[in-house]
Amino acid sequence: MIGKHCILELCECNSVKLDDEAFIRTTIQMASKVAGAQLLNLITHKFVPQGVTGLALLAESHISIHTWPESGYAAVDVFTCGDQTMPDKACQLLVEELQSKRHSLKTLRRDTPVMISNALIN
């Protein structure tokens, strides 16, 4: 396995937190740490009149979050490579910190074409 790609839909979140760029930035830093990932770079952007996007470049891949405070919604991707990281823990932290009352998590296993072919043969 190359890694895990978690796709997280956060609904009914705290709209004030969703619109707070500093809070989103700190929360992404916390998520990368709890996942056991190494944060290389982090950029955020505050939109007018509302919304924040944050992108974290990890040594193991990335975390992205896009918020819509007016809808109480955030779209999150957490992709980590290798067996040592825990993207599901990052997702759980994001659910808790953004106070999501309802969420959906899909986890995809990422493999190389050779690994996929071998799995189909076996």
From Swiss-Prot:
Carrying Pyruvic acid (Ser), the residues are: S61
The UniProt GO MF terms for this protein read:
adenosylmethionine decarboxylase activity
What does this protein's record comment on cofactor binding?
Answer: Binds 1 pyruvoyl group covalently per subunit.
Where is the site labelled Cleavage (non-hydrolytic)?
Answer: E60, S61
Give the record's GO biological process terms. spermidine biosynthetic process
User: Which Gene Ontology terms of cellular component type are present?
Assistant: cytosol
According to UniProt, this protein's pathway is: Amine and polyamine biosynthesis; S-adenosylmethioninamine biosynthesis; S-adenosylmethioninamine from S-adenosyl-L-methionine: step 1/1
Q: Which cofactor does it need?
A: pyruvate
Q: What processing steps or modifications follow its translation?
A: Is synthesized initially as an inactive proenzyme. Formation of the active enzyme involves a self-maturation process in which the active site pyruvoyl group is generated from an internal serine residue via an autocatalytic post-translational modification. Two non-identical subunits are generated from the proenzyme in this reaction, and the pyruvate is formed at the N-terminus of the alpha chain, which is derived from the carboxyl end of the proenzyme.
Known Pfam families for this protein? AdoMet_dc
- What EC numbers are recorded for this enzyme? 4.1.1.50
What chemistry does it catalyse, as a reaction equation?
S-adenosyl-L-methionine + H(+) = S-adenosyl 3-(methylsulfanyl)propylamine + CO2
* Domain of life per record: Bacteria
Q: Where is the active site?
A: S61 (schiff-base intermediate with substrate), H66 (proton acceptor), C81 (proton donor)
Q: Which UniProt keywords apply?
A: Autocatalytic cleavage, Decarboxylase, Lyase, Polyamine biosynthesis, Pyruvate, S-adenosyl-L-methionine, Schiff base, Spermidine biosynthesis, Zymogen
What's this chain's function? Catalyzes the decarboxylation of S-adenosylmethionine to S-adenosylmethioninamine (dcAdoMet), the propylamine donor required for the synthesis of the polyamines spermine and spermidine from the diamine putrescine.
Report the sequence similarity comment from the record.
Answer: Belongs to the prokaryotic AdoMetDC family. Type 1 subfamily.
Task: Tell me how this protein assembles.
Answer: Heterotetramer of two alpha and two beta chains arranged as a dimer of alpha/beta heterodimers.
This protein is called what? S-adenosylmethionine decarboxylase proenzyme
| Organism (species) | Prochlorococcus marinus (strain MIT 9211)
